[in-house]
Amino acid sequence: MTFTRPTPRDDLIYLTEGGFEPELLYLHGIDLPCFAAFAILSNPAKRAIFRGIYERVCDVAAAEGTGLLLGWIGYRASPDWGGKLGLSPDGLKEATLAGIEFLEELRRAY
């Protein structure tokens, strides 16, 4: 996996997401143990819902011609929180890589 860090442009307005967890919880009824949204990526149905949420933001940025900065939902993907979720260090690594691939898929699509 190659990582490139784009340089923000001074002449471009950027849209950012403001956190999707409340929508997952309250509109879709998805339980987020320890408020760890990254854990839902292993469930295909929940992943599809999550992708739809992200795609809406991507669609707005594309339609408005703005840049887009997406954060990853893995701020809880640490050994402490992973342990509370029953993840081994290898399981946590897999979840982290799955989250990165999730954002890479979106980047390629847009």
Which residues does each PLM region occupy?
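Domain-level signal for soluble alpha/beta catalytic cores
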Residues: 1-110
